[in-house]
UniProtKB/Swiss-Prot annotation:
Protein name: UPF0352 protein VIBHAR_03027
Protein family membership: Belongs to the UPF0352 family.
Pfam families registered for this protein in UniProt: DUF1414
InterPro entries associated with the record: UPF0352, YejL_sf
Naturally occurring in which organism (per UniProt): Vibrio campbellii (strain ATCC BAA-1116)
Amino acid sequence: MPITSKYTDEQVEKILAEVGAVLEKHAASPELTLMIAGNIATNVLNQQVAASQRKVIAEKFAQALISSLEVPKAH
């Protein structure tokens, strides 16, 4: 999602492939996959981020997600 990252593409792609394999194994629908991704994000924010920073980080995360979407241009 971010343009620059302290993590390598290889690190991210490896974990993404493993998570994708688990979702595929369970035949997770797009809706279930998004629900799981949202729950993971919520749990990380609530358990690993200071309460004073949660909203700011959640807003930045949401904006990065929106920015990364491939949306067709209207004519």
